[in-house]
Amino acid sequence: MIRQVLPPSVEQLEAARRVIADHLIATPTITLSLRGRPVLVKMESLQPTGSFKVRGALAAVDAARRDDPNGAVITASAGNHGLGIAYASSVLGVPATVVVPKNASAAKVKKLGNYMIELIQFGSSFDEAQAHGMALAEERSIRFISPFNNSDVIAGQSTVFDEILLQAPELEHLVISVGGGGLLSGALISRDAHGRADIRVTGVQPYESAALYHVLRGASMAEVVHRPTIADGLAGGGDDGSVTNDLIASHDVPLLLVPEIEIRRAVREAAENNGIVIEGSASASYAAITNDLVDDATSRVGFIASGRNISLELLLEILQEPLA
């Protein structure tokens, strides 16, 4: 049963900004040339865990600690949110359990093993891992922290957009990769708070696993078909009752679908042409821009390099693929 969650309050937004300022860097927003077009790139891949998700994790674990200084937390994750919870656990001193599916990225599982957490591999999908994590939370009477359906997590993710506005006020259109919708929801909340409705926001999902895209068109999560994708951080995910669904629907955000082959090409192009390593989840946004899926040829466009946690084996495989 999905617990009803409200959008973050002003107090939650302020608390998230404080704990993130104490423990994380303000990642730079740089300009890269994507097939000759200057594009603003928010380098969240430079975070200590290699992903923006550490922001929401820090905010949520900090909130749990303030509510119960002697408590513990548990989460389910495809990898990056789990790394964020593990990092937050280490710096805030809160015991944590992370449940990941058995097919989670080997690179992310290896990094999780470096933290003093309880790591559980369960199920063949994020949804199965999440169900197990929620059952354990109830059994142990500890807090479950969803990667997206959590107001403190969304508050933490909103700080990405806060920083972009300070670093690149000229931004006119931001493209955001979407799984459960935590980052997109955070960006929308920040945009509203700063009175920047002039900035367009577009979401991107992998064609092979686009739960939110279909749910916002009337499907239930159970009806959505998921196929393998290298954008593993966007795969599966989503809850029928998630607050992110309502936030995104109320802002009428367009969602685009990107084919798997273009996500793979974007990983390669980012490395070969721009010298940056980004995982498939971030590459979905890159691909949407470079393949002209974003209907905006003149605006100052940007995207979030949301993570770098791709295995060396997969990266080498993609780099060695013949160019079509």
What is each residue range found by the language model?
Residues 1-324:
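PLP-dependent amino-acid enzyme catalytic core
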